[in-house]
Amino acid sequence: MRYCPRCASPLVECGIAGRARLSCPDAACGYVFWDNPLPVLAGLVERDGLVVLARNHAWPEKMFGLVTGFMERGETPEEGVAREVQEELGLVTRSASLIGIYPFQRKNEIILAYHVVAEGEIALNEELAEFRLIPPEKLRPWDFGTGLAIRDWLARRSS
């Protein structure tokens, strides 16, 4: 963000509430860009005992991940993850339980990750290129973002 959304003045960096923040230099305006993290939903989707990993069209050929998306106004996180699973995979959510909350600082996001038990036939939407059904014991978590949720989910399953 380079300009004030209220008065169009160029934003400047200054110390506010103990941190460097972008703000409007016009004292009459007073706009501060707080740059708060955005909540993102992630679904570790299990269908018929297998985990669904999906590849976004924008991702490299061998890169697969969990279903993710943003909440809509007025929905609970559980409703939001069920909607994302329906929209992206065409599956109906039978249950959604919180795995955990994870930082994704590279994108200034907070991930709310859910274990979703779903049913139906997979029908990918236009965002996704392909999917894979993986037995849980073959999952290999990565060390950031939604990979941390996979790690925690696998640890709970084995205990």
Residue ranges and their predicted role:
Residues 137-143, 147-149, 153-159:
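Long C-terminal interaction/binding lobes of large macromolecular proteins
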Residues 3, 23, 44, 53, ...:
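Conserved hydrophobic/aromatic beta-strand scaffold that supports enzyme active sites
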Residues 1-42:
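Acidic, metal-coordinating catalytic segment for phosphate/diphosphate chemistry
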Residues 46-87:
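Conserved Nudix-box catalytic region and its N-terminal flanking loop in Nudix hydrolases
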Residues 14-15, 92-100:
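A short coil-to-beta-strand element that immediately follows conserved catalytic motifs
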Residues 123-128, 142-145:
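Short, charged, solvent-exposed linker or helix-capping segments at domain edges/interfaces
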Residues 102-123, 132, 136, 153-154:
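Active-site-adjacent beta-strand/loop module that shapes the phosphate/pyrophosphate-binding cleft
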